[in-house]
Amino acid sequence: MDNNKIDDVMFESKKRVYRFGGKQAEGDGTMRELLGGKGANLAEMSRLGMPVPAGFTITTECCAEYYALGGGYTEELKMDVGAALVATEKIMGKKFGDPENPLLVSCRSGARSSMPGMMDTILNIGLCSETLPGMIKKTGNPRFVYDSYRRLIMMYSDVVMEKAEGIEPEDGQSIRQQLDRMMAELKEAKGYKSDTEITADELKDLCEQFKAKVKEVLGVEFPDTAKDQLWGSIGGVFKSWNGKRAIAYRRIERIPDDWGTAVNVQSMVFGNMGEDSATGVAFSRNPATGDNKFYGEWLINAQGEDVVAGIRTPNPLNEATKNDHNRNLKSLETAMPEVYKELDEIRLKLENHFHDMQDIEFTIQEGKLWMLQCRIGKRTGLAALQMAMDMLGEGMIDEKTAIMRVAPAQLDEILHPILNPASEKIATKLAQGLPASPGGAVGTIVFTSEAAMAVAKNGGKCILIREETSPEDIEGMRAAAGILTTRGGMTSHAALVARGWGKCCIVGCEAMKINLEKKTVTFSEGGKAFKEGEWISLNGTKGLVYGEKIETMDASENPLFINFMAIVDKYRKLGIRTNADTPEDAAKALSFGAEGIGLFRIEHMFYGKNSETPLAKLRKMIMCDTDKERKAALSELEPFIKAAVKSTLRIMDGKPVVFRLLDPPLHEFVPKSDDKKAELAAELGVSVQEIEKRGESLHEINPMMGLRGVRLHVTYPFIAETQYRAIFTATAELLKEGLNPMPEIMIPVTVSARELSFQKAICDRVKAEIEGQTMTAIYYKFGTMIEIPRAALTADRMARAAEFFSFGTNDLTQMTFGFSRDDVGTFMGDYLGNKIIDDDPFQTIDTKAVGRLVEFGIQGGRSRRPDLKCGICGEHGGDPDSISFFNTIGIDYVSCSPFRVPIARLAAAQAEIAQSK
């Protein structure tokens, strides 16, 4: 940033700090962009009269200032923070840095969009040599004070002194890991099982050892004044916005880099002051299933990070939260009934206020409840659907809000596979953990994030196994098919993140023992040591682990899904068709609500299942030496084309089906193997050498821009005739059966209106022949695929012959960018990483050029033919962001793969709702 801009940033007059607490606040829940989600909700809870520890929020704009100033603070910010600190002291009756009555604070990040665990938190700021004695005197609890101090040293050295400074750990051991190891060694030497068994004197000694280790490893003293700790923490939170894991999460969730994070400085309340103190995380409804039951976990004598970190199995909040792992642990409902009742009332008040499921963090200090956070809770796709429909039924939200509550990706998750119940029934169960995120996952074992990414990169499926996950594992968690951890509860990091992504996850699988050195894992119920690379299967709905590869199957549709989709369809104007190449695809798409087929590729009958005979006939035609021989070979092929067309039209009775004529270059179908060459040679009565010679003659330097699509049909009109005859014969036969077939014929790779006119003449001639032979009137639509820029730019002329356009955005993107779709992976990562482009244009439509060509094509075509139907049949037809754009430019329908049909239906409705506001 240049100096003038820095001056503008430094001296611009604006409010940088917003105070909250004492049942009042300067901000409110609408100010997410400025205060971040956490700050806005802390302000809103304060305004609602809830017990929120006082504090203040430094705005997201200050994050931009911090980076603009090269990691510094304006004088205005320093003054505003000082004033807010005084106001906080007044409410809490304590003073920051005071030797006798010290106020301690926490420092937490808060982006406007929830990023659980991706940025950093520091607790107990203000504990130093000057305040420790006063804190001990005031609380009468030296063990609590030194436990709080050791936590500060661990967090601050990790977040501020190492990560924020960009220091790479030596030998892969971060300062936090080294301090954790020191504490574990102390427990082992003393025979302690729990942290709470460590005595006050032992904790005091440990704190001194920690500080010495910090100096040894990081080369600087641990800060020993409250002021230094506070400003170091504020900077550490700002820097964590650009930490590796935060950047990786933003890439996955598509959160803009320039949003920045707010910083929330809040008075500390303590859950680690004894048996009448606790900390917990709760959800106003079950985040895994959507059930309308209060759900959560808590830990006695602990601080907030202990629950989320998943270091020990927490207690259940109530009866609804009990499972096989925590059934014998005391619930908050029975241990502290009055506190539980107050918390239950608060969750109902919050949910009714925000009209959405709330994720709540709370602390109980010596029997008093304090609310530390509320936010819209992450949930699985199944839970999102359940909650949306339940809240609609309860009158809490309207239909449009219900539609907007389920993300398109969550619908994808609902349709995700489950383990085949029949196979699962006879499989051997290895272990059971907590069902943190539902569905089935099958994959090979990996133990590190890096290994998971490597497997996924090679197209494999893996299960990431960890003691517990940390935010550093974020990319590996994304890459894995499923996640399995030894420790942690239903609100641990692994559970929260997996639920947000709809990824199968089991946590708290305590029977599992991991040996990282040997790269093995054993399950006490099985005994066998499983090595990295071996297959296991997870049932995330029940928390079950199996030591074998179990096949998966589609989750059955439930009435809730059907009812939800019926509401969705009321609010969209875009039609949704499917790309289907087989009758099976067509039937599946129809069950998902497809309104027709936008792309049936005739050449796909020559690939895959049952393709051997038609492919042999096609090869025979290709390798014939004369047109007479080719026509004879085509007559053998025609019945196969007709059969595929007829069965598809039958399934889609009364719905349009777009048949695209043969598109690929002929050389793609030339036999490669010696035995297939020999078979073809024998069929044609020529030598293998002659077959090879004829095959070689079809070779092109640049086949994707060579003899393919319409060019093939202009060069060999009888190939087009065969396809037209098959389509019209199938149509006539179905009409005679009393059905209502609706064929639409699409010519690919066109660049000229004359190409279309040439083909239309052949098509109409063949149609007339079939009508005469069958005494049946046939109705069809004739159109073209617009996939070359010239076709889009001359669309007014193309519409003379074409009754519909279907934009093939895959090739249109290829031709516009000059990127090869097959080779784009070699550089796309660098282009995205260096922000040369914002999105992969093959996944999300490029609105600046490709999108403009589509829009220009629509306008040009309709200037000639006002009733011209326009559709999309590229991969973009199933991309929610692209659908949102298509909804604004006059597209009539999008076409996508069968499993993306529900996603496209939802995305189209959401686009219409958002754009009509």
Residue ranges of model-derived segments:
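Extended, non-globular alpha-helical segments
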Residues: 433-472, 523-563
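Glycine-rich phosphate/ribose-binding loops and adjacent secondary-structure elements
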Residues: 368-370, 470-478, 482, 490-496, ...
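Conserved alpha/beta-domain cores
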Residues: 108-109, 557-560, 567-917
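Nucleotide/phosphate-binding sheet-loop regions of phosphoryl- and nucleotidyl-transfer enzymes
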Residues: 2-427, 435, 460-463, 470-472, ...
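Short gly/pro/ser/thr-enriched loop/turn and capping motifs at secondary-structure boundaries
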Residues: 59-60, 64-65, 491-493, 512-516, ...
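C-terminal accessory/binding modules appended to enzymatic or scaffolding proteins
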Residues: 13, 24-32, 437-479, 850-867
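Short beta->alpha connector loops at strand-helix junctions that form conserved
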Residues: 56, 486-488, 507-511, 600, ...
